[in-house]
Amino acid sequence: MSKMRFFALQELSNRKPLEITTPSNKLSDYYASHVFDRKKMQEYLPKEAYKAVVDATEKGTPISREMADLIANGMKSWAKSLNVTHYTHWFQPLTDGTAEKHDGFIEFGEDGEVIERFSGKLLIQQEPDASSFPNGGIRNTFEARGYTAWDVSSPAFVVDTTLCIPTIFISYTGEALDYKTPLLKALAAVDKAATEVCQLFDKNITRVFTNLGWEQEYFLVDTSLYNARPDLRLTGRTLMGHSSAKDQQLEDHYFGSIPPRVTAFMKELEIECHKLGIPVKTRHNEVAPNQFELAPIFENCNLANDHNQLVMDLMKRIARKHHFAVLFHEKPYNGVNGSGKHNNWSLCTDTGINLFAPGKNPKGNMLFLTFLVNVLMMVHKNQDLLRASIMSAGNSHRLGANEAPPAILSIFLGSQLSATLDEIVRQVTNSKMTPEEKTTLKLGIGRIPEILLDTTDRNRTSPFAFTGNRFEFRAAGSSANCAAAMIAINAAMANQLNEFKASVDKLMEEGIGKDEAIFRILKENIIASEPIRFEGDGYSEEWKQEAARRGLTNICHVPEALMHYTDNQSRAVLIGERIFNETELACRLEVELEKYTMKVQIESRVLGDLAINHIVPIAVSYQNRLLENLCRMKEIFSEEEYEVMSADRKELIKEISHRVSAIKVLVRDMTEARKVANHKENFKEKAFAYEETVRPYLESIRDHIDHLEMEIDDEIWPLPKYRELLFTK
């Protein structure tokens, strides 16, 4: 292995940036060239077929089989112009990745001749094996049938020579087995609930859309070094490795000059993204060495999520051409920042109003305040659900590590906006408001745009921060599917808005005027949600203590956090808003707990193998060299000189012996703990056992190995070190 390490470093020194040529000097010449968007539809579809797609997208009108055949034929004709040979239903199973099965257009005609055919039936529905994907026990191996069904709202696209059709994935009995199905339901739920609240202010509003802008963080590592680290290859993170003398402490990497090889990778990635209609806009160095970020312009939430999954696939594929491996793990290296995926979330009406941006008059600001306060209440009531939606084995290393938001959910608004809410509480009473009181209150609300213009600061320690015209959910992990967080947020928001509307309606039925009813319910919600508002340092110990006093939960135990998917409040949201049924929700919990168990199990096995078969032999070999050196010294020096000059070596031999013995014992005990955990039949008990009895060994074993790394001759250490992984360009 040590030879492999030095061969990797030698190979790395010969790397050169690839030459990247853009298809055209004008981005507009090739932007979305590989997407079957409306412009292409108008060209390739009959008018009635084009109208059927538009009606299905905007109104939810079903597409007839006759229209589906016309659409499929037009889609195939367009795809053939790009030399496409295959098609696939592209879907997002519960694996934090995408899935696809490629079929050729080739069929035999009645006379035995080969023809190319793509029918409406093939476009609309296919049958992959549902038992081979995570399904939480919904499908047995002998009950393999599942269905993929076309998502009309997300346009088909071409990658290489394959036509990819975005689809949902459901079981034979109709249960969702993917991320897209519940996401579409959550978006529909928040659309309906938000529209009803909006119509208290403006009857012209008939739809509310959810927008998402994601920020994808990632690490790059040269493939030669990556291949020399079995832990990186098999788990996505380094299970051992002493920190480099220099890491991120000089703060010289963030927004620094991008290395030429990385720039070439980013250029090619952007070209491929733009061909697929993905509006990537920003690229830069992140805080940690060899860490970077890619961010697009925000889009409709469903499409934005599809694009993020597609980008992650593209990054892996393109990185290989540039001799890089992309690391999406939330914490690939100890001691430096991990990677997140900030979700910038907003709601916009079909009349062009951003509901999270102040209006141009008091009425518009009332609408803004109504949605702002409902977000506060939504997060306050559903903090455990939001945490569960982003909790994973990888993300647990990052949350609360003074680099990412803590596991405590709170909202940052900025002091001025918080003061405005406090003023509403002070001015609104339970008695009937006078016209003068209403005017004073509305005038104060009218000043909100002036307040936010210069005083909406950024608090990087807040997990859910208001940033002027959107909320930024910063707790999501870099490897996650955005849909998990977006399902939770939008379903919870729909639930909260429905409750708000019902409360306002009740007061109006009692004879209270609409404006006053809204003010009263807003006041109640501002008071009730006050514990969730926090303007200070989310990393501090003081905040943990203060959060506990406020009654906020702080759950770092992964299985315990995931269990809140099925607590009473989460069920009221996810089942109450018809995002999941009972079976589907139980399935989600089982899948997440099993994923956690398997990831810790793999890490444990990999670390045990590396420790016993790679590190211990090297340590013993070096120890033997030291012992041989002692024997030679004893032959040369006098006994007195020998005792003085050999003391440090004897101490080192003793230290290595202690570390090697400890590693062997810990690996043995970890293996036994794993066996006990594996015999637990209940998936919940197994996950808890892995968290509490297996996972702690990973850090203990690592600690001994990291000490050995600093004590053993660099020439024989088998694995690439942090200084090589992080500082080779």
Curated annotation (Swiss-Prot):
The chain positions of domain GS catalytic read 179-615
- The UniProt record gives the binding positions of ATP as S346, R458
Enumerate the residues binding L-glutamate.
N337, G338, R458
Q: According to the UniProt record, what class of enzyme is this?
A: ligase
Q: Which GO terms describe its molecular function?
A: ATP binding; glutamine synthetase activity; metal ion binding
GO CC annotation: cytoplasm
Keywords (A to Z) from UniProt? ATP-binding, Cytoplasm, Ligase, Magnesium, Metal-binding, Nucleotide-binding
Gene Ontology biological-process annotations? glutamine biosynthetic process
- Textual note on the cofactor: Binds 2 Mg(2+) ions per subunit.
User: Gene3D superfamilies of this UniProt entry?
Assistant: 1.20.120.1560, Glutamine synthetase/guanido kinase, catalytic domain
- Activity regulation: Inhibited by L-histidine (46%), L-arginine (38%) and L-methionine-DL-sulphoximine. The activity of this enzyme is not controlled by adenylation.
Q: Is Metal-binding tagged as a keyword?
A: yes
Q: Which InterPro entries match?
A: Gln-synt_C, Gln_synt_N, Gln_synth/guanido_kin_cat_dom, Gln_synth_cat_dom, Gln_synth_gly_rich_site, GS_Type-3, GSIII_N
Principal localisation: cytoplasm
SMART domains associated with the record: Gln-synt_C (SM01230)
Enzyme Commission (EC) number: 6.3.1.2
Q: Is Coiled coil one of the keywords UniProt gives this record? A: no
Cofactor names from the entry are:
Mg(2+)
Q: Where does Mg(2+) 2 bind?
A: E217, E286, E293
List each copy of the GS beta-grasp domain by range. Answer: 85-174
Give me the residues that bind Mg(2+) 1, please: E215, H342
Q: Which reaction does it catalyse?
A: L-glutamate + NH4(+) + ATP = L-glutamine + ADP + phosphate + H(+)
Q: How does it assemble?
A: Homohexamer.
| Functional note | Catalyzes the ATP-dependent biosynthesis of glutamine from glutamate and ammonia.
Q: What is this protein called?
A: Glutamine synthetase
Source species, please? Answer: Bacteroides fragilis (strain YCH46)
